[in-house]
A protein has these predicted regions:
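Acidic, proline/glycine-rich intrinsically disordered inter-domain spacer in sigma factors
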Residues: 1-7, 11
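Residues within the DNA-recognition helix of helix-turn-helix
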Residues: 55-58
């Protein structure tokens, strides 16, 4: 994942993280903030790599949906 996308998702996680499930939030924090690999996250949560990939994908989609509907990050960045 590119650094730009990582920073963007980390910002969305900071704003909308409480709206995710506890598991999705923890997986995203591990992936984005702690820079753990998908394998490491799977081992820590006792799930398969595919389950981690699915959780990341669903969480990314939810975070983007919240931003599309609410637009807090755009407002914080001074965009319209």
């Amino acid at each position: 994942m590119s650094l730009e996308k990582n920073l963007y998702l980390a910002s969305l996680l900071d704003l909308y993280g409480p709206l995710l499930s506890a598991t999705q939030r923890q997986v995203m924090e591990d992936y984005l903030l702690k820079d753990l690999t998908i394998t490491e996250i799977g081992q820590n949560h006792d799930v398969s790599r595919q389950a981690v990939k699915d959780a990341i994908s669903k969480a990314e989609a939810k975070l983007q949906m919240y931003e599309n509907k609410l637009g807090f990050l755009k407002r914080l960045n001074g965009e319209r």
